[in-house]
Amino acid sequence: MLPYRQTDKMTELVLYEQIDAVAVISLNRPERLNAMDQAMLKELNQAAERAEQDDRIRAVVLTGAGNAFSSGFDLKAQAENTPQGVNEWRPVLKRNFDACMSFWHLAKPTVAAVHGPALAGACELSMACDITIADETAIFGEPELRFGAGIVVMLLPWMVGPKRAKEIILLGLDDISAREAKEMGLINRIVPKGEDLNTALSIAKKLSRIDSSLMAQTKQALNRSYAIMGMEEALEFALETDTQIEGEGMPTKAKFLQIARDQGLRAAITWRDSLTEDD
């Protein structure tokens, strides 16, 4: 029997497909490595809400079109239209935070299918999913501090522990292989190149066959254990810290965005990388 399929576009930025009882949500800016601008994040939130409200959907897969899961939040768009001060930054960062955490809070199980880069906000988005599958091309990292930005969704300590989290965040590492990510507990499984989506879909179909009320209540209990340990309060504190950082405006971030405006994002990244080259 062939699977039931229904494909819709939320916009050109987010694709939504139903395969049997699974919603497959795809970030869809492949020409920009699925960099997440504010329009995409709004549609991503709407896609998550759509899956939550649809009784036919019992599991969700999140992936990226083309050669990347996502390069993270859109720095080119930020350079072209930079918020000023805490009051302008607060709603932007809250939208970023909510879009990522919607996959953590969804009552239905969520599975990330990662290939290529999953950096900064996209790394955080992949962590927010219940299960993360990565193919052998996947690269993870949190490079924000290297260009003067803070961490929007500081899930990393809860996934890999304080020592690894501090190393990754404070050094701004952005070259963590799938193998390294698996060893530190950042992802669940590594699969051959190009098999991440098929594997994630297979897992999601298995999850969809479990009683939906049982699944929702058990996921809620699992999430509650982290809340009792203080995760939600810690995440809110980190979000407020990032809001203050961006509102204040770090000199490195100002320089990075200026180079991005004048010479392009690639030149800005080259300049950023030069700051932390080995002596």
Show the residue positions of the predicted features.
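Glycine- (often His-adjacent) and acidic-residue-rich active-site loop
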Residues: G64-A99, A118, G264
